[in-house]
UniProtKB/Swiss-Prot annotation:
Entry membrane topology: Multi-pass membrane protein
GO cellular component term, pick one: plasma membrane
Highest taxon above the source species: Bacteria
Protein name per Swiss-Prot or TrEMBL: UPF0344 protein SSP1805
NCBIfam families tied to this protein: PRK13673.1-2, PRK13673.1-6
Similarity-based family: Belongs to the UPF0344 family.
Main location: membrane
Organism (species): Staphylococcus saprophyticus subsp. saprophyticus (strain ATCC 15305 / DSM 20229 / NCIMB 8711 / NCTC 7292 / S-41)
TM regions (residue ranges): 1-21, 36-56, 68-88, 100-120
Compartments reported by the entry: Cell membrane
UniProtKB keywords: Cell membrane, Membrane, Transmembrane, Transmembrane helix
HAMAP family: UPF0344
């Protein structure tokens, strides 16, 4: 389930940038915007469901520590999904969205850093921490 979660958030980030840049402030939406936005929403659901599943598995396995970080990552993940949707919606309505775009990028990076240092993350597994 962890591999599906990682693959879905990688595709989610790619689709977010594709949707954001397929909507021009002057010309409006490109013909590809609506399908990309629908795929973006589908992958948002996949990320949330798989992330919640990983969260449940981690708590039920009784793994030593990391529960506070895992809960923080879950909150950051929900914030990323919410920020992505609000950013695309503001861009679609013609309102300024550059600040939200940068906020979304910062929260994405923060969420990825938390995910990397979690007990199931690559850094922890690589060094046996």
């Amino acid at each position: 389930m962890l591999h599906m979660h990682i693959a879905s958030w990688v595709l989610l980030i790619i689709l977010f940038f594709a949707a954001y840049f397929n909507f021009s402030e002057k010309q409006g939406a490109s013909p590809y915007f609506k399908p990309i936005h629908m795929l973006l929403r589908l992958f948002m659901l996949l990320v949330l469901i798989s992330g919640f599943w990983v969260w449940i598995q981690s708590f039920s396995s009784g793994a030593a520590g990391g529960h506070m970080l895992l809960t923080l990552k879950m909150i950051c993940g929900v914030a990323v999904v919410a920020l992505m949707e609000v950013t695309i919606t503001k861009r679609k309505k013609g309102q300024p969205s550059h600040g939200l775009m940068w906020t979304t990028i910062v929260v994405i990076i923060l969420t990825m850093i938390i995910g990397i240092i979690l007990p199931m993350g690559p850094i922890t597994q690589m060094f046996g921490l």
